[in-house]
Amino acid sequence: MNKFIKKINFIKNFSSCENWEEKYLYIIELGNKLSPFPEKFRKNSNLIPGCQNDSWIYLIYENTKKIKFYGDSNSLIVKGLIAIIFILHEDLKLSEILTFDVKPYFNKLSLTNYLTPSRVQGLSSISKFIKKSARCLLIKEKIL
């Protein structure tokens, strides 16, 4: 998924799903659209702590001042949840990521109502990992 769908389109599409099964399939579909995860990023430093499944995230701050998101998981649903979180963070500046809260979006979509407690914890871990990565990129940019 080189270019994510916009937040508004995601919310519209997700909300138009008639039942949880359709939403679940849509989440998996989003995960399948993620850009391939480069093997060189598949290391322990990019492994998301607190996820039951092996899941990786890597952020690149490009010369265009855009953030390139990479994510992968050995769970289809977690991979889709990573894609959703990337969609919600799309077009944010590094500094905005530090204060961005995904919870209102999850509440609006009732997403956490349909997930197991461990998946909800995984969402929190993914969000924290993205904030940590953004903070590291900000520090690196200020030093360079």
Curated annotation (Swiss-Prot):
The active site is at 51 (cysteine persulfide intermediate). InterPro entries: Cysteine_desulfuration_SufE, Fe-S_metab-assoc_dom. One of its GO terms (biological process) is sulfur compound metabolic process. Its main location: cytoplasm. GO terms for cellular component: cytoplasm. Keywords: Cytoplasm. The keyword Repressor does not apply. The keyword Cytoplasm applies. It holds the Pfam family SufE. Pathway: Cofactor biosynthesis; iron-sulfur cluster biosynthesis. Participates in cysteine desulfuration mediated by SufS. Cysteine desulfuration mobilizes sulfur from L-cysteine to yield L-alanine and constitutes an essential step in sulfur metabolism for biosynthesis of a variety of sulfur-containing biomolecules. Functions as a sulfur acceptor for SufS, by mediating the direct transfer of the sulfur atom from the S-sulfanylcysteine of SufS, an intermediate product of cysteine desulfuration process. Homodimer. Interacts with SufS. This is Cysteine desulfuration protein SufE. The lineage of its organism: Bacteria, Pseudomonadati, Pseudomonadota, Gammaproteobacteria, Enterobacterales.
